[in-house]
Curated annotation (Swiss-Prot):
Methylated by PrmB. GO terms for cellular component: cytosolic large ribosomal subunit. Transmembrane segments: none annotated. SUPFAM superfamilies: Translation proteins (SSF50447). This is Large ribosomal subunit protein uL3. It comes from Granulibacter bethesdensis (strain ATCC BAA-1260 / CGDNIH1). The modification N5-methylglutamine is found at residue 151.
Amino acid sequence: MRTGLIARKLGMTRLFKEDGTHVPVTVLHLDQVQVVDTRTKERDGYTAVQLGFGQAKPKHVSKANKGHFARVKVEPKKKLVEFRVAEDAILEPGATLSAEHFLVGQKVDVTGTSKGKGFAGAMKRWNFAGLEASHGVSISHRSHGSTGNRQDPGKTFKNKKMAGHLGDERVTTQNVEVAHVDAARGLLMIRGSIPGAKGGYVLVRDAVKRKRPEGVAYPAALQADAAASEG
């Protein structure tokens, strides 16, 4: 199991194929994604890598984090995230990952925070049918109807589908396809839509329900390796 990547969602566009058909894609940007720290079995009880995204202004970094970044000699990062990895996939702090970490056509899992929609009714939140348009129904056309049973059990059960807060939660979309990779500009283009608003952070991993395709870089595709192969 190798590390994933952290990226920022730029929005959606489309790519044109040679036959003229087009594919809707979501554009993700990798901005100086570096390994900041590692977790080892001996010290932490598990193996993982901590990745940092972007470059933060020093005034926005706490003293504790300044010391953390100084210890590993990495510029302060805007966002930190941790990926569990196998013992043979641990990377050295300071290594910069490339968009070529994923291959065109590869299936990936993308995790993001869905758009918050505020307080929503049962029809929008749970796709309920609502009540009758007439036949004695008034005012309650979009309500969810009864929530309980009778004197026994005499309560509304926990997790009953009702009106409430919709969105703004962690969502993972599985088995989406990598449509295009632009390593020079640090862009990943994923076929279709993925969770989250423009400007939000997303995590991209190898699909857990698919075998890792042949030819992917292991333990990771680093920018120095990509530059050497282009040269």
